[in-house]
Regions:
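Catalytic cysteine-centered active loop of the rhodanese-like fold, especially the PTP/DSP P-loop
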Residues: 294-347
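Active-site HxH/HxHxD metal-binding segment of metal-dependent hydrolases
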Residues: 13, 24, 34-110, 127, ...
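Positively charged, proline/Ser/Thr-rich regional signature most characteristic
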Residues: 235-312, 316, 355
Length: 357
């Protein structure tokens, strides 16, 4: 079975794509974003797959790649086009190469035009392709910087992408209107820049008169991406919480396991967000836990110290996850949710006050 997830970075409107072989438990990630690396690593962990490689469709100008961060955390190989000009990759790709994950693979098609090193990745059965910034949904990427060439882009799209089967689904690196997927058949017919009977000279004339401003992050993103996302020597690396062993979930929440909470409880504020009848009910409560029901937590955050870590607790971990987000938005920096809540706490034999034996 193929694992497929389309992931989104709202800051840069970038799509990243996770593809995996469920039976072999191997996966690849196309166009990871630096700020989303923690999220992506959490998803990969939850799906139980090994990330064997990150793949870039090109050297991006609007965001920094998460390739190096993911390699640092998960050991994945950094992979991109040999024509990209980037340094520090583990594998440089050429037209016709294959990137394997389990029994599946992506075929590399050189599609220069947006940049000189653009590639499109085509799944082995040609059911889907990942077009980067070369072909967008009812549009195309720009071709006015980073060795861009509108003639090359036109030829790339016409010869390497729109020659795929009509039913082949196309997934771009960006969309700014909330669109998520298109198909070869649709783009052949409806793409106003590259579809139908539009000729090369028509496309070149259109692209040469776009007059677009350069991406805001180009002076940061391009140099960083030419290093495959590796930070400069004096740059600060993302800091993991050091007050307890925590796990970052795909839901965007830090979780603490019962054993870790028990071991570090002396330095932690525990806030129980259940209702009073639950707090005094059969499950009991953790020693020292302060009762502040979720419904009134926003109004009572002043009762919690901001210079000490906070762990939110409820029956199962659902309400306390919401409480964790609320506290983060209220300016608390060190917040975690008790994984599994009081149900798991008791099931694992940790001490409680009150409750039924």
């Amino acid at each position: 079975m193929l694992i497929f997830r389309q992931l989104f970075d709202p800051q840069s409107s970038t799509y990243s794509y996770l593809l995996g072989d469920a039976r072999a438990c191997e996966a690849v990630l196309i166009d990871p974003v630096f700020e989303q690396a923690r999220r992506d690593a959490a998803l990969i962990s939850e799906l139980g797959v090994k990330l064997v490689a990150t793949l870039e469709t090109h050297v991006h100008a609007d965001h920094v790649t998460g390739a190096w961060l993911l390699q640092r955390q998960l050991g994945s190989a950094i992979t991109l086009s040999a024509a990209s000009g980037a340094e520090g990759a583990d594998r440089y790709l050429a037209h016709g190469d294959r990137v394997k994950f389990g029994r599946r693979y992506l075929e590399v098609r050189a599609t220069p035009g947006h940049t000189q090193g653009c590639v499109t990745y085509v799944l082995d059965d040609e059911s889907m392709a990942f077009t980067g910034d070369c072909l967008l949904i009812r549009g195309s990427g720009r071709a006015d910087f980073q060795q861009g060439d509108p003639r090359a882009m036109y030829r790339s799209v016409r010869s390497q992408i729109l020659t795929l089967p009509p039913a082949c689904l196309l997934y771009p690196a960006h969309d700014y209107r909330g669109l998520t997927v298109t198909s070869v058949g649709e783009e052949r017919r409806y793409n106003p820049r590259l579809g139908g009977e539009i000729g090369e000279s028509d496309f070149v004339g259109y692209m040469n008169n776009l007059g677009l401003p350069h991406p805001k992050l180009i002076d940061i993103a391009v140099p960083a991406n030419l290093r495959c996302g590796h930070p400069e020597k004096d740059a600060a690396l993302p800091v993991e919480p050091g007050w307890a062993p925590l796990t970052f979930t795909f839901a965007g929440i830090w979780e603490i396991q019962p054993d870790a909470l028990e071991e570090n409880a002396a330095n932690i504020q525990i806030v129980d967000v259940r209702e009073p009848d639950e707090y005094h009910g059969p499950l009991g409560r953790i020693h020292g836990a302060k009762l502040i029901p979720l419904g009134v937590l926003a109004a009572r955050t002043g009762e919690l110290a901001r210079d000490r870590p906070v762990v939110a607790v409820c029956r199962s971990g659902a309400r306390s996850a919401q409480a964790s987000i609320l506290l983060q938005h209220a300016g608390f920096n060190d917040v975690a949710n008790l994984a599994g809540g009081m149900l798991r706490w008791r099931a694992e034999g940790h001490a409680v006050e009150g409750g039924q034996a």
